[in-house]
Amino acid sequence: MNALLTNPFKERLRKGEVQIGLWLSSTTSYMAEIAATSGYDWLLIDGEHAPNTIQDLYHQLQAVAPYASQPVIRPVEGSKSLIKQVLDIGAQTLLIPMVDTADQARQVSSATRYPPYGERGVGASVARAARWGRIENYMAQVNDSLCLLVQVESKTALDNLDEILDVEGIDGVFIGPADLSASLGYPDNAGHPEVQRIIETSIRRIRAAGKAAGFLAVAPDMAQQCLAWGANFVAVGVDTMLYSDALDQRLAMFKSGKNGPRIKGSY
């Protein structure tokens, strides 16, 4: 199979294009495929807070593969062994949570790349990523098609942001609003003026360094604000929250005293 590996999500980030995404926390390929038919530019398949196994992630990658929406996998953490598994099942774009230092960023970057550029384990002949050995020259071309995003979501990470941005192999930095606001002393309050100020300056610093800047904002006005600050990959909802809100709104039409939607600034 003489196939050229491409990553449309990464290519659009390189061009500075804005990409609108959706968070998938439902853990099912059925819901993932429904989301893929909606036309979002990218879909974050969450393995950090949603109870996704490697097989769950694999099945969701299969479900969205026929569609234009680009999958982004967030594993529960950035260990070398877990990154190897996620890449082998076919993920091309990773979002690694809780990256606090440049050393962590370098370790993550190394784990995504084959030698001599990194230390990813070699197993293309048994991996979906290489179509079980049928993609010719897979190891020679895969590094260029991988997109590595890291999450900055603590005060420590903010203090080290410039050093993280300098790490080779990091394509973008995602600001995690929920954990960041808690780390700054404002738990469950990403809308606090001080948190908002830090989010704005961080997004601008990321873009000034030539990297992509990402954010999750379930409130439309917050999403628009982040786009105005320069964020260029923004998730504007979470599937489980949208589903529960839709259920609540429908029930409220027929039963008095029921609550309406609960959309907030963070999840």
From Swiss-Prot:
What positions are marked as the site Increases basicity of active site His? Answer: 88
Please write the reaction equations for the catalytic activity of this protein.
Answer: 2-dehydro-3-deoxy-L-rhamnonate = (S)-lactaldehyde + pyruvate
InterPro entries named in the record = Aldolase/citrate-lyase_domain, HpcH-HpaI_aldolase, KDR_aldolase, Pyrv/PenolPyrv_kinase-like_dom, Pyrv_kinase-like_dom_sf
Q: Cofactor stoichiometry and binding? A: Binds 1 Mg(2+) ion per subunit.
State whether keyword Magnesium applies: yes
Q: Which GO terms describe its cellular component?
A: cytoplasm
Q: Which residues does UniProt mark as catalytic?
A: 49 (proton acceptor)
Q: What EC number(s) does the entry state? A: 4.1.2.53
* Enzyme class name: lyase
Molecular function (GO) terms for this protein are: 2-keto-3-deoxy-L-rhamnonate aldolase activity; magnesium ion binding
Q: Where does Mg(2+) bind?
A: 153, 179
Protein name according to UniProt: 2-keto-3-deoxy-L-rhamnonate aldolase
Source species: Shigella boydii serotype 4 (strain Sb227)
